[in-house]
Amino acid sequence: MNSAKATSLLFQGFRKNCLRLNRISFASGLINRFTVPARTYADEKVFVRKKPHVNIGTIGHVDHGKTTLTAAITKCLSDLGQASFMDYSQIDKAPEEKARGITISSAHVEYETANRHYAHVDCPGHADYIKNMITGAATMDGAIIVVSATDGQMPQTREHLLLARQVGVKQIVVYINKVDMVEPDMIELVEMEMRELLSEYGFDGDNTPIVSGSALCALEGREPEIGLNSITKLMEAVDSYITLPERKTDVPFLMAIEDVFSISGRGTVVTGRVERGTLKKGAEIEIVGYGSHLKTTVTGIEMFKKQLDAAVAGDNCGLLLRSIKREQLKRGMIVAQPGTVAPHQKFKASFYILTKEEGGRRTGFVDKYRPQLYSRTSDVTVELTHPDPNDSDKMVMPGDNVEMICTLIHPIVIEKGQRFTVREGGSTVGTALVTELLD
């Protein structure tokens, strides 16, 4: 299946179970720590990198048990001292805290196995997470797809596999849930169907680990063979099958801003996922995009409510900035090593325009069409025109592969070879790749 053509399927019915990788569980900790005068850095916990860090998430159809499984993982690992238990209600409601009038999402789960440190996300209801998944800004290193033994594969099972493939997830582990409610023959049938589906969407269906169990039994401490033991087998499979991602740590630092928070008397915090490079506390950085070019110093770094001496590629972290006001910053700006990135407003890109059947436009469009462009965490209006002025009356039709000139209403940091998506009215118009910078 052409993954570009399949992109729009990701957005059909993808509501409640969006996973939001870049949202900030640590932000409340940042604000609380940096604003309590009695506390000093010496009092705070330090994040120690004893194990490789991997970003993971649960995906799958609504009500198949993703959140219950996430809670069960934290419960089973908490008994080993490798996690803090979070029950279903803590995860499902995506709890928010207000600090100085700022609403902060905090449904990000942290845990460890014997071999790795994991950031696991399961945040139902965050509609804006779709934007991150479109652009690949919140790419997971691996995923657990949950499928109910009572239903088998369902529409969102397929959609989420497409989503995972589109954002670059190469390895997935399957958890067949609710096995206590069906006969063994049904479990075998679901496993066979899942292997076929994985192969259909470009995964290794023959060798993908499939674990059967009951997340609810594990959570409630019942029937250990399908409860606790299944969680143990699942995490062993995740450890062994999902390879450690290669992080680009020896290149200049870059992080797209996801959120911005103001801390009175201390500075401003920006949060996001480090795309590449390494950043040490005390380093000078530039913030670029939307016509702004700011310079400042990083006075603090935190992840999972713990201090970091340095942020590296793959980290979901918060940066405390000196002498920068919240009003100067916005989502979509880029934090980077000074002199390494530049904003652009005009470039050439190679497009695939989705068809009506794929959820795209029903009709074509002509020159000066103005949809929204999503790149990393940026969201900006773009005007599309043909490279050859003689083609200005030529209509671009759904299903076309075409080169277009993109002109943004505001400059953003965008690079040759970078992928992006254009959308209109809540649906995806096309996917594209930057082929040439024109300014």
Curated annotation (Swiss-Prot):
Residues 122-125 are annotated as: G3. The keyword Cell cycle does not apply. It comes from the Eukaryota. Residues 101-105 are annotated as: G2. This protein promotes the GTP-dependent binding of aminoacyl-tRNA to the A-site of ribosomes during protein biosynthesis. Belongs to the TRAFAC class translation factor GTPase superfamily. Classic translation factor GTPase family. EF-Tu/EF-1A subfamily. This is Elongation factor Tu, mitochondrial. It comes from Schizosaccharomyces pombe (strain 972 / ATCC 24843) (Fission yeast). The gene is tuf1.
